[in-house]
């Protein structure tokens, strides 16, 4: 069996960003997957996708049984990811990961929030801002946090984006818009436990892997994964949380 591992590399715009560690992590993951597959006796090819040569690189993929898709461009680089996913779909080769349409849906948190609302799945109170001139809704609940809608991996999540009153919303929204391209949203901050839950498709149905809990050593509005607490090992915030994989789970969680 032969597997081709395709992964996104930092664009020229993002490679100089303070958030480039997220793309470095994609490369590390690709190499780890390559190593694991080799140990299982599977032949592999690693393809680091560059935004300037997406079409030629993907079109050149031949004689492989499966494409392991690790394309993870988001934010202003989202069009590159959409293009790459659409090309992978045209090859007629089985692939892992999202389809083009699915990638678009899950890359925009506002779209996901609307889908949850439509399906009556409860989520924290929220409001989207496209221009920064919108008035804050009276229904917003505080404290809230201001998030970029098109980024992942805690990009844009920081302590200074917590808002405790309606009068501060406009200032924080504009600041977030200056930092990142695209719309932002304000979401009620809810204290509680945080879990990472991976879901795979198995025989056409969702298959839930064991949850992993992020346990915080702080409380209140300090207890969430900022970019620094997730990626910067030298930052004080990094030591405020740890990963915990319990052997058993409370029935109410499952």
Summary of predicted features, one role per range:
Residues 166-252:
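Phosphate-binding site of ATP-dependent enzymes
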Residues 22-29, 165, 250-253:
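Residue-level preference for long, well-ordered alpha-helices that form the structural scaffold
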Residues 1-6, 61, 103-185, 191-193, ...:
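Active-site nucleotide/adenylate-binding loops and adjacent lid/helix of ATP-dependent enzymes
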Residues 1-94, 101, 107, 111, ...:
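ATP-binding N-terminal substructure of ATP-dependent carboxylate-amine bond-forming enzymes
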Residues 44, 94-95, 123, 144:
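Hydrophobic beta-strand scaffold residues
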Residues 12-15, 152-155, 234-237:
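Short acidic/His/Gly/Ser-rich catalytic and metal-binding motifs that mark active-site loops
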Residues 14, 75, 153, 194, ...:
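Conserved protein kinase catalytic core
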Residues 48-50, 99, 127-130, 164, ...:
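Residues at the C-termini of beta-strands that transition into short coil/loop
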């Amino acid at each position: 069996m032969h597997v081709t591992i395709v992964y996104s590399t930092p664009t020229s715009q993002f490679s100089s960003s303070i958030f480039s560690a997220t793309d470095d992590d994609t490369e590390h993951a690709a190499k780890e997957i390559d190593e694991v597959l080799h140990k299982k006796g599977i032949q592999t090819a690693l393809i680091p996708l560059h935004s300037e040569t997406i079409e030629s690189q993907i079109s050149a993929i031949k004689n492989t049984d499966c494409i392991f898709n690790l394309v993870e461009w988001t934010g202003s680089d989202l069009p590159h990811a959409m293009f790459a996913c659409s090309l992978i779909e045209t090859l007629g080769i089985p692939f892992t990961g999202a389809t083009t349409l699915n990638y678009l849906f899950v890359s925009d948190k506002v779209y996901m929030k609307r889908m949850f609302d439509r399906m009556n799945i409860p989520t924290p109170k929220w409001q989207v801002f496209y221009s920064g001139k919108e008035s804050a809704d009276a229904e917003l609940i505080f404290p809230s946090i201001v998030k970029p809608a098109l980024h992942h991996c805690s990009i844009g999540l920081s302590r200074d984006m917590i808002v405790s009153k309606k009068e501060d919303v406009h200032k924080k929204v504009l600041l977030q818009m200056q930092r990142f391209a695209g719309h932002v949203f304000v979401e009620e901050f809810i204290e509680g436990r945080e879990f990472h839950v991976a879901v795979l498709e198995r025989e056409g149905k969702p298959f839930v892997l064991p949850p992993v809990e992020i346990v915080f050593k702080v409380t209140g509005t300090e207890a969430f994964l900022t970019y620094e607490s997730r990626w910067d090992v030298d930052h004080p915030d990094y030591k405020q949380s740890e990963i915990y994989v319990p052997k058993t789970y409370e029935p109410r969680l499952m």
